[in-house]
């Protein structure tokens, strides 16, 4: 088992002079070590690499998604675990390293998690207002249910979670400098 998974993760960030190459990022570190051993590239600055580099990651993720689907269809829980580990390895590990995002991935992940959690409602009143707004907006009947100390609004016909009126989109742009954005978008 990875040593960094056994400790609380607290990497250095913008104010640190240490290169992201040396940050401890669970899952990414193991792939970095593998790539170093195999002579494969690791990027440490945000980049859109050559097409063959990102296509390798894309194709590998798609292959593993297919293996996941096949394992589920067969009822093969070991195959499911294998596919999920491979998906994580390729997407979080290789994807992060091929795009030079090691120094950004953890804070970005936390931002996405906070955004996802904002889909729930803190109060009954917020849930009731969310039901009203989402029902009008989407023209679908909605209802809410209390789950623990939160309220979740669902579309009634299929139980799809509807976003709270206080939902916020993750702001991932905040993790890039203007220069990094210019260099990677061509603008």
Residue positions per predicted region:
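Flexible "arm" and connector segments at domain edges
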Residues: 2-187
């Amino acid at each position: 088992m990875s040593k960094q998974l056994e400790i609380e993760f607290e990497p250095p960030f913008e104010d640190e002079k240490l290169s992201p190459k040396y940050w401890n990022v669970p899952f990414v570190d193991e792939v970095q070590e593998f790539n170093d051993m195999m002579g494969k590239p690791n990027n440490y600055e945000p980049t859109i690499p050559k097409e063959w580099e990102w296509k390798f990651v894309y194709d590998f993720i798609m292959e593993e998604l297919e293996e996941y689907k096949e394992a589920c269809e067969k009822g093969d829980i070991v195959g499911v675990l294998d596919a999920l580990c491979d998906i994580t390895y390729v997407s979080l590990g290789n994807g992060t390293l091929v795009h030079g995002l090691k120094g950004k991935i953890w804070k970005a992940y936390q931002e996405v998690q906070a955004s996802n959690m904002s889909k729930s409602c803190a109060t009954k009143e917020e849930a009731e207002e969310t039901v009203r707004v989402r029902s009008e907006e989407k023209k679908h009947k909605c209802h809410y249910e209390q789950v623990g100390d939160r309220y979740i609004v669902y579309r009634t016909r299929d139980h799809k979670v509807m976003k709270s009126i206080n939902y916020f989109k993750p702001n991932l742009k905040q993790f890039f400098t203007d220069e990094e954005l210019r260099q990677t978008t061509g603008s």
